[in-house]
From Swiss-Prot:
Domain spans labelled S1 motif: 35-105, 120-183, 204-272, 289-359, 377-444, 461-525
Lineage, highest ranks first: Bacteria, Pseudomonadati, Campylobacterota, Epsilonproteobacteria, Campylobacterales
UniProt-listed GO biological process terms: translation
GO terms for MF: mRNA binding; structural constituent of ribosome
Function statement: Binds mRNA; thus facilitating recognition of the initiation point. It is needed to translate mRNA with a short Shine-Dalgarno (SD) purine-rich sequence.
Family statement drawn from the similarity comment of this UniProt entry: Belongs to the bacterial ribosomal protein bS1 family.
Disulfide bonds: none
InterPro entries, alphabetized: NA-bd_OB-fold (IPR012340), Ribos_protein_bS1-like (IPR050437), Ribosomal_bS1 (IPR000110), Ribosomal_protein_S1-like (IPR035104), S1_domain (IPR003029)
UniProt key word Ribosomal protein: yes
Stored SUPFAM superfamilies: Nucleic acid-binding proteins
UniProt keywords, alphabetically: Repeat, Ribonucleoprotein, Ribosomal protein, RNA-binding
SMART domains: S1 (SM00316)
Protein name: Small ribosomal subunit protein bS1
Domain of life: Bacteria
């Protein structure tokens, strides 16, 4: 081959190479920033968290793996899988994004859906991002741009996660963006809200709405495109209720408009206005004294609220739960959701109040006790309460009082010093007071009293000895055979009271034994008379030779 031919071939190859190179350059130049391309996953680097995606020719883009990873951490795409990506930068290794591609496709679909008549169309979404110019709002998977000047939001606050409503004001097909405005929404909505509110107020039939938000003071319901507040007192005929127990976001509910504040642009709605007033219905169906079945709906320390049905709630006061006076808390007897039978004790339709009783459907424990026991019966009771004056014993449904002076023969003893809560004591019924529903008990009457023991050893007019244990204004007490014996002031003669000392031994004669009152009285004065009487008797029966003078000499 000649040199000329070789040169020609070289020139042809160079020309062909140049053409091919130019075509490749043209291909790369068509890969503009912001383009959506169908690429191919060519490699996955899990350690560094990225995948390389071929987007045409020799160009490969870097894709973050977190964009194609599900909630469980599993990759949605594998090597050699086709994938749609958004090209964020030009060059040999541009940045690509799967999420942006999907988002841009959704935006484009929304733009086509809106058509030409998009202006002032209302969207509701959540703020998911923020940039220098404003906020990104997401609604049904589509991202919208809310500029700061159209946001009506405070610049110094964090609004991420906040739900907003806005009007569409601009659509950019080339840049795949939709601009929205809260400022425009308020302008459009205020006018529309006034018109629709008037329409709702004039409506005679309930309107179907959707629960949009639940708060402690009520629920916001959207009806005919505008929102109104159903105050918690307008939810049920029961009165104020907890909104969260009745509804959740997204629930459909019928409402009626009851007021509109034009100055504050607030629409008030009511749910209970759409329901027939049950209080009018029950006036002819329920009467005091009727027994009805109810369900416990709420428990407080002061009583229980019960659901009667038909949106009516009754109140069971804590004192009407049990005949037991020691009801510490209603939840010790009842639980929410429990079905019980109660007796109606009062109906007040005007004030929407209905009171019921649980205990009045059972026999009064006192009446049951009275039918089974009588005065004098001996039984056991458990100490329920201790006081300064005695102890209350539980006798099985009723309490009886064991007073200190009926518990011990020793008047200085007290129940609280000798018993504890839960002790079981054998007692005797002293009294059953039907009028006041009270029971008096005694423990001391089941044991022999000190006076009875004393009476077994001593009779009236017998002589006893004892030491002085106390001196009172009315007399002196001596202890004789384990019992305190009273010597009144008038019975001390010939002893002088002001000369008597504690511990002094006194001889006297028994003048009275009161077993029922556990009292013994004695007299020194009567002892002297007794001695004189005995001496006189001795004189009358003595030898005639003994004279009265002799007797007197002996005394002297």
């Amino acid at each position: 081959m000649s040199k000329i031919a070789d040169d020609q071939n070289f020139n042809d190859e160079e020309e062909n190479f140049a053409k091919l190179f130019k075509k490749e350059l043209e291909k790369e130049e068509t890969l503009e920033k912001g383009t959506i391309k169908e690429g191919l996953v060519v490699s996955i680097n899990e350690n560094d968290g990225y995948a390389m995606v071929s987007v045409g020719g020799k160009t490969e883009g870097r894709l973050a793996l977190n964009e194609i990873t599900d909630e469980k951490g599993q990759l949605l795409y594998q090597k050699n899988d086709p994938i749609i990506v958004h090209v964020s930068e030009k060059g040999e290794h541009p940045s690509v994004s799967y999420k942006k591609a999907i988002s841009q496709q959704k935006i484009q679909a929304k733009i086509e859906e809106l058509g030409e008549n998009y202006e002032n169309a209302i969207i509701e979404g959540k703020i998911v991002g923020k940039n220098k110019g404003g906020y990104i709002v997401e609604s049904q998977g589509v991202e919208y741009f809310l500029s700061r000047s159209h946001s009506s939001l405070k610049n110094d606050a964090n609004h991420i996660g906040k739900r907003v409503k806005a009007c569409i004001i601009r659509v950019d097909k080339e840049n795949h963006s939709i601009n929205i405005s809260r400022k425009r929404f308020f302008e459009v909505n205020d006018k529309r809200q006034l018109e629709v509110s008037k329409e709702l107020l004039e409506a005679t039939e309930p309107v179907l709405g959707v629960v949009r938000q639940i708060t402690p003071f009520g629920i916001f319901v959207e009806a005919k495109g505008i929102e109104g507040l159903v105050h918690y007192s307008e939810i049920s005929h029961k009165g104020p209720v907890n909104p969260e127990k009745y509804y959740k976001e997204g629930d459909e509910v019928y409402v009626k408009a009851i007021a509109y504040d034009a100055e504050k642009r607030r629409l008030s709605l009511s749910i209970k206005a759409t329901i027939e007033d049950p209080w009018e219905e029950i006036q002819d169906k329920l009467k005091p004294g009727y027994a009805i079945k109810v369900v416990v709906s709420n428990i407080e320390h002061y009583g229980v609220f019960v659901d009667i049905g038909n949106d009516i709630e009754g109140f069971l006061h804590v004192s009407e739960i049990s005949w037991d006076k020691n009801v510490s808390h209603p939840n010790n007897y009842l639980s929410v959701g429990q079905e019980i039978d109660v007796k109606i004790i009062d109906i007040d339709p005007k004030n929407r109040r209905l009171r019921v009783s649980l205990k009045q459907l059972t026999n009064r424990p006192f009446d049951v006790f009275e039918s089974k026991h009588q005065v004098g019966d001996v039984l056991e009771g458990k100490v329920a309460t201790l006081t300064d004056f005695g102890a209350f014993l539980n006798l099985g449904g009723v309490d009886g009082l064991l007073h200190n002076h009926d518990a011990f023969w020793d008047k200085d003893k007290k129940c609280k010093d000798h018993y504890k809560i839960g002790d079981v004591i054998k007692v005797k019924i002293l009294k059953i007071n039907k009028k006041d529903k009270k029971i008096s008990l005694s423990a001391k009457h089941l044991v022999t009293s000190p006076t009875e023991e004393f009476a077994q050893k001593h009779k009236t007019d017998s002589v006893i000895q004892g030491k002085v244990v106390s001196i009172k204004d009315f007399g002196v007490f001596i202890n004789a055979d384990g019992i305190d014996v009273l010597i009144k002031n008038e019975d001390l003669n010939p002893l002088k009271k002001d000369e008597i000392k504690i511990g002094q031994e006194i001889t006297c004669v028994v003048v009275a034994i009161e077993k029922s009152n556990n009292k013994v009285r004695a007299s020194v004065h009567r002892l002297e008379r007794k001695k004189e009487k005995e001496e006189l008797q001795a004189f009358n029966t003595s030898d005639d030779k003994m004279t009265l003078g002799d007797i007197l000499k002996e005394k002297l």
